[in-house]
Amino acid sequence: MERAIFAGGCFWCMVQPFEEQAGILSVRSGYTGGHVHNPSYEQVCSKTTGHTEAVEIIFDPSLISYSDLVELYWAQTDPTDAFGQFEDRGDNYRPVIYYTDERQREIAERSKQTLQASGRFDQPIVTSIEPAEPFYLAEDYHQGFYQKNPERYAQSSAIRHQFLEEHWQ
């Protein structure tokens, strides 16, 4: 099994696209990249901990590759916005691919270069690619949010879905 960590704005909106893929064993919402041990949602939202909301994905590389996950990640984000994603603003919502080893870093960097060269976006691709740091699970009420709260999830993801349809379909 392998692990991937992606930050792409509100973690609620990052779970479902990955959970629907064959070879995914788990997708958990949490926080990473900051300087506070095991922060709470309230602490992360205060923008004082340095953490980003992210998802940790455990996957079977014999069924789905890390490269496939990176491609799926791009299609869930606005890679030209370094200051948050969609209606969620601030460092805690910035887009980041966290790599767990050198191979993942190389795949992510190559994929970013390919996306930049594709001309899909007029602006530069600014998503960060950074080494993985400790990942802290978010509170239980954040886990599987789209399943537990479908109406609120639909409202919170509407702007994202509109952007994705315009730029990734």
Curated annotation (Swiss-Prot):
Per UniProt, which keywords does this protein have? Oxidoreductase
Q: Does the keyword Oxidoreductase apply?
A: yes
List the SUPFAM superfamilies. Peptide methionine sulfoxide reductase (SSF55068)
Q: Name one GO molecular function term.
A: L-methionine:thioredoxin-disulfide S-oxidoreductase activity
Gene3D superfamilies per the UniProt record, alphabetical: Peptide methionine sulphoxide reductase MsrA
UniProt catalytic activity: L-methionyl-[protein] + [thioredoxin]-disulfide + H2O = L-methionyl-(S)-S-oxide-[protein] + [thioredoxin]-dithiol; [thioredoxin]-disulfide + L-methionine + H2O = L-methionine (S)-S-oxide + [thioredoxin]-dithiol
Looking at the Swiss-Prot or TrEMBL record, what is one Pfam family this protein matches?
PMSR
**Enzyme class label:** oxidoreductase
| Protein EC | 1.8.4.11
What protein family does this chain belong to?
Belongs to the MsrA Met sulfoxide reductase family.
Q: HAMAP family from the entry?
A: MsrA
**Function in brief:** Has an important function as a repair enzyme for proteins that have been inactivated by oxidation. Catalyzes the reversible oxidation-reduction of methionine sulfoxide in proteins to methionine.
Name of the protein this chain belongs to: Peptide methionine sulfoxide reductase MsrA
| Species of provenance | Streptococcus equi subsp. equi (strain 4047)
